[in-house]
Amino acid sequence: MAEYYLISQLPSLDGINESTPLPITSERFTELCERFLGKKAQGEFQRITLAPPRNSEKVSSDLIEKWNDGERNLRLALAKLRAEKLGKSFESDSQSFSTGLLQAARTAVEIESPMEAEKFLNKYRLDFLETLRPMDSFSEEFVFYYGLKLKLIERIRKFDPESGEAAYRNIYDSIMNGDRSEVTQ
């Protein structure tokens, strides 16, 4: 019942673009979740991440489980394709990927600009998340969906093209030269 009060206070994230101010911050959203969600749902809420661990951890939320699987597979497909492009080996535990996911990963790997590749991947992630959107807009699963969508929108807004390009070049040069100096910087 409490999620009704929570969700009714949330502004819509639909139609938000890069120039539109966000109607809510992660901090405010977290405050509302801590206030209205039960302990079990709060535990699941704390496990929402844009970077799930490589080895899957069982969660009770179907939405979070599907998100984690999709994001993990996307990251593994990207790593595999990037490694192939550089002539390196990559251990992916004989992972098989869907055709759509592989096509998205191939497209992202072929985009020259890292910033444009990230924008493409962010759109792919938002589209994937939309396929997971719960039918019941007043459920705990919808709260988790909303949290993931807010995190994705905030993530792309944090990108700074100039510093990102410099960091990318540093890491790329380090990898191509076979050293690990990017880790210490």
Where are these regions (language model features)?
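Extended alpha-helical surfaces
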Residues: 1-185
